[in-house]
Amino acid sequence: MFHLPLPGAIYRADGTTAFTLWAPSAHRVELVLLDPMLQTIPMQPIGYGCWHAVTTAPPGTRYRYRLDGSRERPDPASRCQPEGVHGPSAVIDHHFVWHDEAWQGVALADLVIYELHVGTFTPEGTFEAIIPYLPLLRDLGITAIELMPVAHFPGVRNWGYDGVYLYAPHTTYGGVRGLKRLVDAAHAHGLAVFLDVVYNHFGPEGNYLWDIAPPAFTDRYRTPWGAAINYDGPESDLVRWLIIENALEWLREYHIDGLRLDATHAIFDMSPYHVLEELADRVQEQALRLGRPAYLFA
């Protein structure tokens, strides 16, 4: 197994930000910082088709990647898309003051799950607008809420199954900080939080991974919603890296208690070690490190 930095822009304790992009077809990649002034920084190849740069880029800095001197693209592993799926990506700081240190999760036998859509559950359609309703859900006997997919999609309202930025909670819902506040509040009310994730296809608009890393997709399989994700062909190790690190980030950075995997019948993998098995193994390793249960279900 290879060891790579986390994908995307990672703001670090020393005030620098590490940028890592999987762009296996590119011969040259530059990081283009748009704030506070336009700056172009060459990225270095680090193997496996990945490119890396470390520079000063505080939270809020907007950026793109420039491939082979001409094509400027957002970050497929962006944590924030403040101007939508076609706009620049933005650096975020994952630091958050949590209050759920004593949280031990909910036992499997005690789960009573309420599925909700963030955009339609309240008139405001945001993560934080859900918080006042948590006591009501708890008093109904609910022990966990399941959020329909929140990964950034085109526009402001969507069922969530057209997501194209797997690492970015949708901006109109409240983004990174809004989701963390919701999870923290849910745990304070004794409610677990599950997240619906889509690892079988990407949405049709704003999927720049197709252009930046063509091996992420395969024509050997078909889904009804878009190109199948390459989990077992050439360079599929990098695809697994992108997807599995995404799952682990929801658990680690957002304190999500488990993931509901959408349409697992469309996650095609004929390799000896199926990606779902690998995902389950890595999630359980993460649960042991976190000291609380983490569930996967479909």
Could you describe each region identified by the protein language model?
Residues 22-29, 58:
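Short proline/glycine-enriched turn/loop motifs at strand-loop junctions of beta-rich domains
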Residues 33-35:
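Short acidic, flexible loop segments centered on an aromatic residue
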